[in-house]
């Protein structure tokens, strides 16, 4: 090869070598560009961000630490999402007053159902729209000043699912209520009767369910709530529902409810019952003495005792006062009863009297002396044969001023209660019982007097006089 050809050949090789190097460099540049593109991402705000391995990278933004607000320097463009920005008002959720809707679950056909709208403090909410949906139809009414929305129910007699609704407003929260509404075409009204309000431990609370016409309603469910527990009882043929009471002696609030069924209208009663204790303090082959209490105000500092049964033949006034007293709940003072019961009633009039007197002497007097009574009242009646007066109070032998004072004040109180009362203070010429009970108590410092009424008066008169005496005694220390 001559020199000229050799130079030409070398020039071609150099040219090819240069082209090859250029292609390799272009490839590397393309690869760097791709790698850089793959690191471009989007943040939540939709603005692309360049990521780099170098923390100081190639970002054109100033380091955040360098842009921190110093002193009084402020950012001229506040961030609308910054909750601390003073130019942005903080949103506070408004709290609405809670509301409730209520009504009974029955209505008489073509009569009004009252729906009550109240706030959380049980205050009536007036001038608000309430709706009632029954059998696919929605009725509306505006509450009156008592918070009552009245709905005239004309549906056929049966039970319907009903929805009550209040939509609420800018002050009151919405509320709704669903119930099964019993529409009654021919209502039968009912009533409850409580047999007694004084119940001895272990005895029964007796509740009678009857129509207002007096017909017993059998096989009905009665709910009785006492001392925080609710008991269900079914009425018997005579309408009686019974609940055995095994609570300690005290006064209890009782709620009794009958929800109604068929055409029977619901009825409820809230009462107080006094659970009593009865203690046997003396016993012989002819009689017993019971100590019964507490009756009335258990917190009172005034303690009073009645004595009944001293003379068994005078039982009418004994029975009347005893039954009335044990059923008393709301009284000012604290009361007890000593009850003498003869188990052997065979013998003469004087024999029976002496038995009662001996039971009083041997059991009542020793017990009563230790009780610090403010007053003891012995209950009697007279035939009017030996005594010319038949309605009176007296202190045996007129020997105790505190007893005399209380006796005379009781007479004044009876006269203030009973118009044209014939009661008076009178001391009988003959008295058989004082040595056995009254005089020993007076000697011990316990004020004592005797109440007498006529043995042959009508029962209604005896009951009336017992009632008035109880009322008067409950004011005697005022």
Predicted regions, residues:
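Glycine-centered loop-to-beta-strand initiation motif
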Residues: 143-151, 235-243
């Amino acid at each position: 090869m001559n020199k000229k050809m050799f130079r030409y050949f070398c020039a071609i090789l150099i040219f090819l070598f240069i082209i090859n190097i250029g292609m390799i460099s272009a490839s590397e540049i393309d690869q760097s560009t791709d790698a850089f593109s793959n690191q471009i991402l989007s943040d939540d705000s939709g603005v692309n961000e360049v990521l780099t391995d170098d923390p100081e990278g190639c970002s054109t933004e100033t380091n955040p630490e360098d842009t921190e607000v110093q002193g009084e320097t402020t950012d001229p463009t506040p961030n609308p999402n910054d909750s601390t920005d003073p130019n942005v008002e903080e949103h506070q959720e408004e709290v609405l007053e809670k509301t409730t809707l209520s009504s009974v679950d029955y209505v008489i056909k073509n009569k009004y159902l009252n729906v009550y709208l109240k706030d959380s403090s049980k205050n009536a909410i007036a001038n608000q729209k309430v709706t009632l949906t029954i059998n696919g139809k929605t009725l509306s009414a505006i509450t009156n000043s008592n918070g009552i929305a009245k709905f005239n129910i004309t549906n056929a007699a049966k039970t319907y699912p009903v929805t009550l609704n209040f939509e609420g407003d800018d002050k009151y929260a919405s509320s709704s209520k669903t119930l099964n509404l019993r529409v009654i075409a021919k209502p039968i009204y009912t009533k409850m009767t409580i047999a007694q309000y004084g119940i001895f431990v272990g005895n029964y609370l007796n509740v009678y369910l009857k129509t207002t016409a007096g017909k017993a309603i059998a096989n009905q469910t009665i709910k009785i709530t006492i001392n925080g527990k609710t008991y269900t009882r079914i009425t018997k043929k005579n309408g009686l529902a019974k609940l055995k009471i095994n609570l300690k002696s005290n006064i209890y609030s009782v709620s009794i409810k009958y929800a109604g069924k068929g055409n029977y209208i619901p009825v409820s009663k809230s009462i107080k019952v006094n659970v009593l204790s009865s203690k046997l303090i003396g016993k012989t082959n002819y009689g017993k003495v019971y100590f019964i209490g507490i009756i009335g105000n258990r917190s009172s500092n005034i303690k009073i005792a009645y004595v009944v049964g001293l003379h068994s033949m005078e039982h009418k006034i004994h029975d009347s006062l005893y039954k009335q007293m044990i059923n008393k709940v709301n009284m000012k003072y604290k009361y007890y009863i000593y009850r003498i019961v003869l188990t052997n009633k065979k013998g003469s009039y004087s024999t029976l009297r002496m038995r009662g007197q001996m039971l009083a002497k041997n059991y009542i007097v020793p017990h009563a002396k230790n009780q610090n009574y403010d007053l003891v009242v012995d209950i009697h009646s007279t035939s009017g044969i030996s005594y010319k007066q038949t309605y009176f109070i007296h202190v045996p032998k007129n020997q105790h001023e505190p007893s005399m004072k209380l006796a005379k004040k009781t007479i004044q109180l009876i006269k203030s209660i009973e118009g044209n009362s014939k009661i008076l203070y009178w001391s009988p010429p003959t008295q058989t019982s004082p040595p056995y009970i009254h005089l020993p108590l007076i000697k011990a410092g316990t004020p004592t007097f005797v109440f007498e009424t006529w043995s042959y008066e009508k029962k209604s008169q005896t009951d009336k006089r017992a009632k008035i005496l109880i009322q008067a005694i409950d004011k005697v220390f005022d």
